Amino acid sequence: MHPETLVNHIQKLKAVTNKPFGVNLPLLYPEMELLIDVLIREQVPIVFTSAGNPRLWTSFLKDRGCTVIHVVSSVSFALKAIEAGVDGVVAEGFEAGGHNGREETTTMTLLPLVRKSISAPLIAAGGIATGEAMLATFALGAEAVQVGSRFVASLEASC
């Protein structure tokens, strides 16, 4: 994503809400320094990092007031994220849309393993399309869910 595109998306969002929001930033993007600068300048309150080592940017973002949550696909990545100082973890199973980890672990298998390994806030992602699935993630240790693909058909998804 180009920095100008990111600014445009953030400003569109700010125009319709004053609620807290988060931006997902894959750490392998080119122009990372420029994208991070946009997040700081636009005062993004929550940054979800993924696809890279969270150690690279976590302290920098937290020192500037951002809450940092890292997306992981395994217990070992969850532990590395906590060691890097993130505020929370998204445990993303193989059912998730988009880019997944190399492990082919389902969300419902991954969640209790990660929960036993970390005490930080845990968000479930991947294959959550119903209230029942959301409830199941809570029973397995998640405090929240991240839902994406389920909303693709919504009018708001065209932004």
Question: Which residue ranges define each predicted feature?
Answer:
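Small-residue (primarily alanine) positions within well-ordered alpha-helices
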Residues: 78-81, 124, 142
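Short N-terminal micro-motifs specific to bacterial/archaeal maturation
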Residues: 48, 68-69, 125-128, 154
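Active-site entrance/lid segments in N-terminal catalytic domains of soluble metabolic enzymes
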Residues: 1-117
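Loop-centered beta-sheet repeat module
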Residues: 107-136
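Glycine-rich phosphate-binding active-site loops on the catalytic face of alpha/beta enzymes
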Residues: 1-3, 90-104, 128-159
